[in-house]
């Protein structure tokens, strides 16, 4: 009986005992025994083969299931070999086997792709493919698979049904899952070579050798080699510990080579910046940016051509479309430099992760990949984490400025508005020296009664109250700069009215107009400086108006000793002229432009203040965000906005500082310095004492300028409070001993002057300038104009009350009672500062506002999130 007839007539035992063949009944017991042995060996062989494949997969570098391309043992699956007649010799069987293999049709293979049905069971219409899957051999030298010749079975076995030669359904399903994305080419078996394999051990040796071979993907093997080399390199770890390197691991290697080959650190930094400026690649080594247009021609030196070529080789690996790709970046490929930079920045913002981090190591750990058994990497380690725009609680509005030209533009702006403060100081101190000559009938052509003299000193604070109320709408609708500018001409007019006065009415009218301008200026000057000066110098430049105000007071005291009230008024009319000229040179605040929707004007103002070469876009974006937040929460009624809970706290702190500033008695001391020294019986001339007080006030302000950005606001307020408390109680004790106890104090006549000097020194360090400075810092942007108006009006109200009632206070409770009352108020103010006043040193206005209002507003993103910084 021929082999073909035996295959057709034999009864098949699918997985169990052997079927009985036709015709040779004397071999039936032997066939039954061999069938059972064959069934057992089949089960053992299947389990052994798959266990080996699975154990090898756990440590394999590829995600390809090897069991689908292993040749099946013809001893375990004898139906694959041509059936040999029991009486045939081995040589005849081998010849018949060669003819069987030669008669087989050509084998055709194709890669198993994603769209293959993994649940498709083997059918009878697929015998050729099933036959191919069971006869695959180890890889050839070219990377393809060849069919291995099958040795003839050692004994005579009954044939099986041809329909049962396929792999079981569950094994085929697992094999197809693991082969997804892989690309394997196959070649037809060489029939002559197949006939040369005759012993049983060759199959086991070849299968073990095949399983021990490395990954079939040359590209993947190269990437793994590079990654393992980088991760195991101690020099790279030491390099990364000192420097912040690129996210791209191949870029890291490139930077390390640059560092080794650079002759100096400066050359390395230059080359690194050029490299990072044109290249930022994904962590995934299989994702490639098209950077040919950027990289070509970027290196001109012959020494760098090798590094450039190596770098191009690393980032331009050949792609295999059948391999799984973690992220598809086709949408990020740009056609222009601008689009490329935008796409790169967008990609960088999706994920910031260091190549040396634990998560990055896990991404490339082959054990983790093997344990997933062919799953896509994106399911094992997430690669992209979407971040929201509000992910980073930080606003990058201000940046430190070190270029002197940037500082001097801000100094010019501060100096210009400070000249207005000099005029304010001169006008405020005018009554102290002027009333001495104004009440002299020999000098003045009109009569000045004591009551009229009291109104000359007291009407200015009252007018300042009205000016502070009107100044709020002015700075919102006219602008900060324009509001300050409009006070220059009225200052000149008011001084001319006083200088040319022929009656007391003209003097009072001039003082009222001057006081109105003082109220507006005292409101708008701090707001302007707070919105134009950077945090690094805001404390120092913010005290310039106070310093120039003290200069104006000192100038008035000194000039008053040599001039009468009329000539002193003419001097006051000349001081606003340089102030008027300089105000035309400085710009409006960028914040006001932003509040009016004039973004381009705001950009130009920032460029003027920060310098033409400065990058003002981050600061401008911060201003736009702040204004957008303010617009969303703003109401139509501005005054009702002040009463909101979030706005009430900063407004209350500002009002409290103004209250304790004026109730410390400073204006009473300044306005009535000469009279106080006369009442003290001091042997020193009153005008000289006034000049000494002015000099101390001026010098103390400059000490505060030096310390305010070093020690902080609250420390200076503590020192100021303690100094005023001690001196006021000592002065009260001095006047009590002199007026009430009748003790002779002539031997301590120097004590009032000493106490006044320490008192002025303490006031000028803290409570003099800081309330005005913090008014421009702690008030929220959306209510800054109206809140500053209320605070200024409250300050001038307190000034008017103290100045107008100080003489009456002396009559009722005496000098000692007045000073003790002021000292007690300062003692309460110390606890107010400790409990409620925040420290604003070195903080941006947005940071201060968030802290004061007790909420977190929408922030800029990572981010901001800032794209990855390559500063080392």
From Swiss-Prot:
GO terms for molecular function: sugar transmembrane transporter activity; trehalose transmembrane transporter activity. It is a multi-pass membrane protein. Residues 8-22 have a biased composition (Gly residues). Residues 1-40, 53-217, 262-281, 293-315, 340-361 are annotated as: Disordered. Residues 1-406, 476-488, 533-538, 588-650, 709-714, 777-784, 838-872 are cytoplasmic. Belongs to the major facilitator superfamily. Sugar transporter (TC 2.A.1.1) family. Trehalose transporter subfamily. It comes from Drosophila willistoni. This is Facilitated trehalose transporter Tret1. The modification Phosphoserine is found at residues 262-264, 334, 336, 860-861. Keywords: Cell membrane, Glycoprotein, Membrane, Phosphoprotein, Sugar transport, Transmembrane, Transmembrane helix, Transport. Low-capacity facilitative transporter for trehalose. Does not transport maltose, sucrose or lactose. Mediates the bidirectional transfer of trehalose. Responsible for the transport of trehalose synthesized in the fat body and the incorporation of trehalose into other tissues that require a carbon source, thereby regulating trehalose levels in the hemolymph. Glycans are attached at residue 442. Its main location: membrane. InterPro entries: MFS_dom, MFS_ERD6/Tret1-like, MFS_sugar_transport-like, MFS_trans_sf, MFS_Trehalose_Transporter, Sugar/inositol_transpt, Sugar_transporter_CS. It comes from the Eukaryota. One of its GO terms (cellular component) is plasma membrane. Residues 55-68, 84-98, 121-132 have a biased composition (Low complexity). It is found in: Cell membrane. NCBIfam families: SP (TIGR00879). GO terms for biological process: trehalose transport. Coiled coil: none annotated. The chain crosses the membrane at residues 407-427, 455-475, 489-509, 512-532, 539-559, 567-587, 651-671, 688-708, 715-735, 756-776, 785-803, 817-837. Residues 428-454, 510-511, 560-566, 672-687, 736-755, 804-816 are extracellular. The keyword Iron does not apply.
